[in-house]
């Protein structure tokens, strides 16, 4: 997968290209991340990349000319078929379904805003989609872009060590993940659930699904409203709810 990034702070993306899962993906040639800095497309000695907004008001906007030239360079490098995304609080909120959709693209160009944002005409002429990571304001689009890259890269074949890992993540099936345990078997008097030590994979899978359903019901009940649960899942959820009521009543 190829991802181009337009950012005034390209060095921030070393966190993606040199570390962790995405860093290994870059090293093995599964993920290619290239950055363009609008400052490289300025022609004054101060490398100015901000400008005042028409109509006045606080703050500055990213200067149009350097930003557009950087986007054009990224498009030229990408060739045909690259989707251009602007990270913006006004965009579609990123969720697991959105990540899956974005992962079907072989090429993405992510535009990271700074200051008060970018000229609306640049959005109209250069941007295909706007995406947000949540209803809050950040200093720029770099962190949202890194979140998007990390989430999307997990669906690139070969990036994760186990092919099923991405499918079993929280939200992959619309549910929160089940609890996980590793050694020691007993920690501060708390034992690993016996079913996980049984070796019976059918029982283990049933327990995990019950915990996933129950955890979603407890923490994010609105997620269940949009799911068509199977008969088995309904039974498991009812079991969890009954067990939870018994524990809280003790």
From Swiss-Prot:
Assigned GO CC terms: cytosol
CDD domains noted in UniProt: TrmD-like
InterPro entries found in the cross-reference section: Alpha/beta_knot_MTases, tRNA_m1G_MeTrfase_C_sf, tRNA_m1G_MeTrfase_TrmD, tRNA_m1G_MTases_N, tRNA_MeTrfase_TRMD/TRM10
Reactions this protein catalyses: guanosine(37) in tRNA + S-adenosyl-L-methionine = N(1)-methylguanosine(37) in tRNA + S-adenosyl-L-homocysteine + H(+)
Record-level GO BP terms: tRNA N1-guanine methylation
Subcellular location as annotated: Cytoplasm
GO molecular function: tRNA (guanine(37)-N1)-methyltransferase activity
UniProt-listed Enzyme Commission number(s): 2.1.1.228
A Pfam family that the UniProt record links to this protein: tRNA_m1G_MT
TM annotation in the entry: none
Positions bound to S-adenosyl-L-methionine: 113, 133-138
Keywords linked to the UniProt accession: Cytoplasm, Methyltransferase, S-adenosyl-L-methionine, Transferase, tRNA processing
Enzyme class: transferase
Function description: Specifically methylates guanosine-37 in various tRNAs.
Family: Belongs to the RNA methyltransferase TrmD family.
Matches recorded under HAMAP family: TrmD
Subunit: Homodimer.
Protein name in UniProt: tRNA (guanine-N(1)-)-methyltransferase
Organism: Proteus mirabilis (strain HI4320)
Gene: trmD
